[in-house]
A protein has these predicted regions:
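Conserved, carboxylate-rich catalytic/transport cores that coordinate ions
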Residues: 33
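M16 family metallopeptidases and their MPP-like homologs
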Residues: 1-19, 41-47, 97-107, 133-238
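Active/ligand-binding-proximal structured segments within catalytic/core domains
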Residues: 101, 111-123, 131-133
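An aromatic/glycine/proline-enriched structural segment found at the starts
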Residues: 5-6, 10, 38-39, 43-107, ...
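Short, conserved charged micro-motifs
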Residues: 52-56, 111, 168-172
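Peptidyl-prolyl cis-trans isomerase
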Residues: 24-26
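Short amphipathic alpha-helical signal-transduction/dimerization elements
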Residues: 63, 123-127, 178-186
Length: 238
């Protein structure tokens, strides 16, 4: 609710609150289904040791009877540029305080998407990440501290999530994180650190495609964006 005011990302797909589900009529559910779940809005991805003719046979057997419907054009209002900081403080009886900082970032096909992904890895991937070394190991101010991207199709979020140790206020925790971000922005990344994180990404992408299920899902994912051939060029974007 803080990051998005217009775009549907402001609430979960299933609804903003439980009452939305409770108030849904069966006609509303059917209308949603028949609008979005159509052959025109589908991608069939197959990764298996099968002849193409056999794939056609099975595809026709299981899917040809599905009725085609009107094409749906996805048209969502873009989120306006955020010009001021938004804050929300929640008080609850919990074991540890938690701090979340979110920055708007590029969409999944944008030029800066992979830059943000790489930055999140440099900051917090494993015990060689800057956050771990500086704010958990050397100067233990956090129990946990991570940076990650949401991976959204439209303009997404770069998120930093941390749990400060007892005695470290949320304000102090925020200042420590901002100091690390300012330092990151003011200095060039060393070639060794940069290459190490690129290698980790390349390894993850490679191992990710070892199973047929992951291959099929990735092929469909890239076809959704542009072309399934994008699966072969993803690492080059880093």
């Amino acid at each position: 609710p803080l990051c998005y005011k217009i775009h549907p990302y402001k609430w979960a797909t299933i609804g903003e609150k439980i009452q939305h589900i409770e108030d849904a009529k069966i006609d509303d559910v059917k209308a949603f289904f028949f609008k979005h779940y159509t052959p025109r809005n589908s991608i069939l991805s197959i990764a298996a040791d099968l002849e193409f003719e056999k794939i056609q046979e099975f595809s026709n057997k299981w899917f040809s009877s599905i009725e085609d419907r009107n094409e749906y054009t996805r048209c969502l209002s873009p989120e306006p540029v955020q010009l001021e900081k938004r804050e929300l403080r929640v008080e609850r009886n919990v074991p540890n305080d938690a701090l979340y900082i979110a920055f708007h970032m590029d969409n999944r096909m944008g030029e800066d998407y992979h830059v943000a992904d790489l930055i999140s890895d440099i900051l917090s991937r494993g015990k060689s990440g800057r956050f771990y070394k500086k704010l958990i190991r050397d100067n233990p101010k956090f129990i946990e501290l991570s940076a990650f991207i949401m991976g959204s199709l439209d303009n997404g979020l770069f998120v930093i999530a941390g749990k400060p140790v007892k005695g470290t206020s949320l304000e102090a925790a925020y200042d420590l994180i901002r100091a690390e971000l300012d330092l990151f922005a003011s200095e060039l990344i060393g070639e060794r650190e940069l290459q190490k994180n690129k290698n980790k990404i390349k390894s993850s992408l490679t191992f990710q495609e070892m199973s047929n299920l992951n291959k099929a899902m990735s092929l469909a994912y890239y076809e959704l964006f542009d072309s399934s051939s994008g699966i072969n060029n993803e690492f080059l974007k880093y």
